[in-house]
Curated annotation (Swiss-Prot):
It is found in: Cytoplasm. It comes from Rattus norvegicus. This is F-box/LRR-repeat protein 15. Substrate recognition component of a SCF (SKP1-CUL1-F-box protein) E3 ubiquitin-protein ligase complex which mediates the ubiquitination and subsequent proteasomal degradation of SMURF1, thereby acting as a positive regulator of the BMP signaling pathway. Required for dorsal/ventral pattern formation. Also mediates ubiquitination of SMURF2 and WWP2. Required for bone mass maintenance. LRR repeats lie at residues 141-162, 167-188, 194-215, 220-241, 246-267. Keywords: Acetylation, Cytoplasm, Leucine-rich repeat, Repeat, Ubl conjugation pathway.
Length: 300
């Protein structure tokens, strides 16, 4: 290995210990580099070939990689260089790569990291069903995945995920507008027992049929986001109240067919709902009107 650079400004003092003289495996990697932000590590590797080797060894041992730590945008060549030796990743987040990330960029990374448990691909619209198939097939421990705003996710892609990911707990399908009730019903029947968090927000194709099937098959469901699901109504919410004792939060803003009586049972259980009761809404409106604020008590 290339020796470290000499100190600038003169020779090293006798007995002095340089950073790279410390044990790499036992000291520098676990106790120093693990605490240095990724962006700073990329700068550090420019100091010398020895530092570059140290940083590459650290990158190869990464358990968590979030491209946002590098910056709001990351070039394809940089991503390839950063992840070329990584074989132990458990968490992978690639949202900053959404403009250019293709199947051929992602699939090799997935193949080298079968231990992945969390993958965030929000907004990665250039991917296809092939990438999701590789993820489902090669990462059996997958627990969390975000596919928000991935328009290419269709019913067939979701079926593959449901069939091959037995540990799935959290799934973000926000704005995956190709998905319809049938696909969500299949997901509920295959993986509902373990699901804890699900977002179906901004999908006008999802209705009460899907919500009711989720309720009946997801006893551990804690968080459900139905924001903007225009076909969801009170029947679906009532079924949630009946079959989901673990539910902690429900998002139904812009679900215009969901009436307050169906939500009241959940409110009494302490479920966090993003729509205020009608009385509270009326009082807030009154407060906004000139002359009423001194007389309105929101605690009524």
């Amino acid at each position: 290995m290339e020796p470290p650079m000499e100190q600038s400004g003169g020779e090293q003092e006798p007995g002095a210990v340089r950073l790279l003289d410390l044990p790499w495996e036992d000291v520098l990697l676990p106790h120093v580099l693990n605490w240095v932000p990724l962006r700073q590590l990329l700068r550090l590797q420019r100091v010398s070939r020895a530092f570059r080797a140290l940083v590459q060894l650290h990158l190869a041992r990464l358990r968590r990689f979030d491209a946002a730590q590098v910056g709001p945008q990351i070039p394809r060549a940089a991503l390839v260089r950063l992840l070329r030796d990584a074989e132990g990743l458990q968490e992978l987040a690639l949202a900053p790569c959404h403009e250019w990330l293709l199947d051929e960029d992602l699939v090799p990374v997935l193949a080298r990291n079968p231990q992945l448990r969390s993958v965030a691909l929000a907004g990665c619209g250039q991917l296809s069903r092939r990438a999701l198939g590789a993820l489902a097939e090669g990462c059996p421990r997958l627990q969390r995945i975000s596919l928000a705003h991935c328009d290419w996710v269709d019913g067939l892609a979701l079926r593959g995920l449901a069939d091959r990911c037995p540990a799935l707990e959290e799934l973000d399908l926000t704005a995956c507008r190709q998905l319809k009730d049938e696909a969500i019903v299949y997901l509920a029947q295959r993986r509902g027992a373990g699901l804890r968090s699900l977002s179906l927000a901004v999908n006008a194709n999802v209705g009460d049929t899907a919500v009711q099937e989720l309720a009946r098959n997801c006893p551990q469901l804690e968080h459900l986001d139905l924001t903007g699901c225009l076909r969801v109504g009170s029947d679906g919410v009532r079924t949630l109240a009946e079959y989901c004792p673990a539910l902690r939060s429900l998002r139904v803003r812009h679900c215009h067919h969901v009436a307050e009586p169906s939500l009241s049972r959940l409110r009494k259980r302490g479920v966090d709902i993003d729509v205020e009761p009608p009385l509270h809404q009326a009082l807030v409106l009154l407060q906004d009107m000139a002359g009423f604020a001194p007389f309105v008590n929101l605690q009524v």
